[in-house]
Swiss-Prot record:
UniProt protein name: Chaperone protein TorD
Similarity comment: Belongs to the TorD/DmsD family. TorD subfamily.
HAMAP family cross-referenced by the UniProt entry: TorD
Designated gene of the protein: torD
Keywords: Chaperone, Cytoplasm
Function (record text): Involved in the biogenesis of TorA. Acts on TorA before the insertion of the molybdenum cofactor and, as a result, probably favors a conformation of the apoenzyme that is competent for acquiring the cofactor.
Pfam family name, one: Nitrate_red_del
A GO CC term assigned to this protein in UniProt: cytoplasm
Main subcellular location of this protein, as a coarse class: cytoplasm
Localization per Swiss-Prot or TrEMBL: Cytoplasm
Superkingdom, taxonomy of origin: Bacteria
A GO biological process held by the record: protein folding
The keyword Chaperone is annotated on this UniProt entry: yes
Amino acid sequence: MTTLTAQQIACVYAWLAQLFSRELDDEQLTQIASAQMAEWFSLLKSEPPLTAAVNELENRIAALTVRDDARLELAADFCGLFLMTDKQAALPYASAYKQDEQEIKRLLVEAGMETSGNFNEPADHLAIYLELLSHLHFSLGEGTVPARRIDSLRQKTLTALWQWLPEFAARCHQYDSFGFYAALSQLLLVLVECDHQNR
């Protein structure tokens, strides 16, 4: 990626981590349909690889604004996709895709981070990977840790995530009939792919 700054990419990862970690509340629902978010989406669409994914997400958000009981329905979608059995779901854990759940713990230790006691999910949850990537991108912009060290850790994290993210996104597309989380997972997939190629 060329036009987005490290801080902007960090913000996208942090935002996606939040949306994949718990159901949206009324405030978040209002915020994603706001003019401020529309400006943010315009910025993201200035990156050609992200354009189609952002357009689809905006379409799903527009559909949300006219969906009856939008918050409750979206909460049901979240629950069905991410909290049920893996039969017809897209579980957001590396271990659900036969990946090493200890890898993220090693990466967190290397980054000097640990999981929050407020987040009652296993460490191999998708949101933890995204928070780590957000932290690393913010660190790149700060210049306090050598960029080579941060970049090496970023690449390791992206590689570990890429081992299972495509299957997770495919399952979101398969089982999310409304399509909000399918669109969100597609944006994440493209973002991670671009980030991974930007060595």
